[in-house]
C-alpha cells in the first residue's frame, strides 16, 4: 500500500540535492509528514551535517501520509539512482509501509521505477542553533568558482568578511588564490556583517557540498570566528526547498 506520494515535474532539483548530500553523509532518514519531507544526518566523522527540507509547496503534487513516516536511506544507493535522471525527467517519490522507498524517473510515458529497502537509522541529530556574525547570499556560480579556484593551491580554504568584502582565501606551496566579491556586486545578493571574520575549513567537504549549486537558485553563507560554516542552497521551482550543510572549522596549529 502506498503511504505517501510526492511528484515534481523537474527531477533536476532532487538530482543535485541528493547527489551533494550523498557525498557528505552515508545514511539519512527520510521523515514524511503532512507538511513535506525532511532529512537530517551527520557524516561518520561528525565534521559535517546535511539538512534537506522539501515542503509540500515544492511539489507539483503531494499526497501526505495519514501519520508521520520515517524511512532510512543508504545515500550511496540514492545517489546512484538520481544520477540517472535526464534533463527532461519528472520524479515521483512514494513509500510503502515504512519498508520501501520508491523513486520513479521518466517523461512522455516512459518511466523507470527503483525500489530501495528502508534501513535502520540509529540517530537523528537536531539542527544546531548558532549566532553568526556574517550572513551573505550569493549566486551559485560564485561559490562554485571560489571553491574550485581554492582547490588549485590548497586543501584548506579560509572564508571571511572584512569591511564591505566577502572572500575565500587559499594559500599553499603552489601559490595563493583570493576569490572575492564586494557589497553591491551582482554576484552578492545580500550582505550582513556584524564584525570582521576569517575561519578555515576543509576543502574536500566543500567540493562535495557545492554539487548542490547546480540545482540551486541562490546560496546563503553564514559563519563566525572559529565557528561552523553554514551553507544553504535554495532548491525548487521558486526556491521553496533548501539543502543546508554545516561544516566544522579546521583547527590550525
From Swiss-Prot:
PROSITE patterns: PCNA_1
GO MF terms held by the record: DNA binding; DNA polymerase processivity factor activity
SUPFAM superfamilies referenced in this protein's UniProt entry, alphabetically: DNA clamp
A single BP term in Gene Ontology: regulation of DNA replication
Keywords: DNA replication, DNA-binding
Family according to the record: Belongs to the PCNA family.
Summary of the function given for this chain in its UniProt record: Sliding clamp subunit that acts as a moving platform for DNA processing. Responsible for tethering the catalytic subunit of DNA polymerase and other proteins to DNA during high-speed replication.
NCBIfam families: pcna
Subunit structure: Homotrimer. The subunits circularize to form a toroid; DNA passes through its center. Replication factor C (RFC) is required to load the toroid on the DNA.
Name of the protein this chain belongs to: DNA polymerase sliding clamp
Organism the protein comes from: Methanopyrus kandleri (strain AV19 / DSM 6324 / JCM 9639 / NBRC 100938)
Underlying gene: pcn
